[in-house]
C-alpha cells in the first residue's frame, strides 16, 4: 500500500496536470450542475456573510459569486498552483493561496462562513479538514459543503469512465 505522502503527491500531480480540463469543463457556464444547482444554493446559504473562506476554490467561481453578493473579504485556497493561478487571473477581489484543507493558513475564528463545493469527496483526511474548518469559523459561523452523491440525481447523471487516472477509475457524475 502506498504511503500517505506518496498518495498525496500522486493526487496533487493529477490535479495539477488536469487543472485545465477542470477549468474548461466545469467553470464559467460549462457545467449545468454548477450553474443550475450549486451556485444558486451557495448564493442562498452565503448571502449576507462578511468574511468567507472557499476551500478547494479551483478557478474561484464560487468565491467570485460570494464577493458579488457583498462579502467584505473572500479567501480561496486550493492545493494546486494551476488552479490558484487561474483564480488569481480571473480576479474579483479575492485573496487566493495554495493550501490544503488539512492545514488552513488562517488564524482561529477568522471567518463567518466556510464553503467547499465538490471538494470533501476528494479529501483523504476528512476529520482533520473538518477540524480545521471548525477552528477558522467564528462562533455561530456557517459551514456549507456540497457533495456529489448518487441519490441526488438529475437528468444526465450516470457512471463516468475517467481515463485520466492510471488505472482508469469509474465514478458517478451528477448532471
Identify the function of each model-found stretch.
Residues 2-47, 61-65, 83-86, 142-175:
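Conserved class I S-adenosyl-L-methionine
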Residues 46-47, 108, 130:
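A short, aliphatic-rich alpha-helical micro-motif
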Residues 49-51:
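Nucleotide donor/acceptor-binding cores
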Residues 53-55, 59-103:
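Class I SAM-dependent methyltransferase SAM/SAH-binding core
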Residues 102-113:
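A short acidic, Gly/Pro-enriched loop at the edge of an enzyme's catalytic core
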Residues 113-126:
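A short SAM/SAH-binding and catalytic strip from SAM-dependent methyltransferases
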Residues 127-142:
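A short glycine-rich, Lys/Arg-flanked "PGG" loop and its adjoining helix->strand segment in the class I
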